[in-house]
Amino acid sequence: VRRTRSDLNEHELYKSDLDSQGIIFPDIEKPKKIFYELDAELDALYDKTMILLSHEKEGIKYLRYQAIKFLKEEKKAKYKNADVASQALAKLMKTLLVKRIDSSFHAFKESLNRFTIATEAMTKMFANGTVYIAPNLNVNEYVMEEREDELLTKMIALQPTDPTIEICSADDFIAGFAEGLQRDFEILTELNKAWQKIEQDPKLDEFIRRLDTELLQKEINPAQKLVVFSESKETTTHIVK
């Protein structure tokens, strides 16, 4: 049974036990919000981005991460729960991007760029007529570096021991998948291009300003220590730099 600090302090039996051990929980103030502002241009880009990341009809379909869902049945049969797994992965990627943009613009730009490259890699595979499905290999890297021959050799060697590996042709996918993937890539390319031009990050600027003028002041922070939590490691690494 889990107990909160309030439970322990309010329950006489628990409280007396804590007192006998000399254990005291400090009183913690409620979190205080720090607001930051976006200029009109950045605000418009942010709103457009949230629509493209989340809108069911107008937005990205995350098809790069749903390839096995759109395989024809004879190929799809080897993957258990293909539809459920694909939808879960697409939802995970959408959630990740939404969380990244609220973590920091730096983290979002890095994630968006990787997603764009990954989607481009799959469009190139379709254009070349061979689509590689190998969850345990970094297919994107091989394709973007034009090392398909090396990838194919490795996949053939691993295929007897790795049942997830599949070498497909464009015809192995149901109609509409390649077109949907291309649509995703075009949206991502435009979005990525817009965000890579953005150098400002009002949230980070406001945090640094508060760090310099307020958060480490002895009046509110006697120990002058601060623990920073973030949704993304790339955000905290960027702050350190």
Language-model regions: role of each:
Residues 52-75, 156-200, 220:
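Long, low-complexity, polar/charged, intrinsically disordered or flexibly structured peripheral segments
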Residues 1-146:
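Inter-lobe coupling linker of SF2 helicases/translocases
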Residues 10, 120-179, 186-193:
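Non-catalytic helical/coil scaffold and regulatory linker elements
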Residues 83, 87, 91-94, 98, ...:
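Conserved phosphate/pyrophosphate-binding and hydrolysis machinery centered on Walker-type P-loop NTPases
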Residues 199-231:
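Conserved interdomain hinge at the start of the Helicase C-terminal
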Residues 80-88, 193-197, 212-217:
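Asp/Glu-centered strand-loop micro-motifs enriched in Gly/Pro and often flanked by an aromatic residue
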Residues 102, 186-189, 193, 205-216, ...:
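Amphipathic, well-packed alpha-helical segments that form the structural scaffold of globular domains
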Residues 232-241:
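Conserved helicase motor "Helicase C" RecA-like lobe of SF1/SF2 P-loop NTPases
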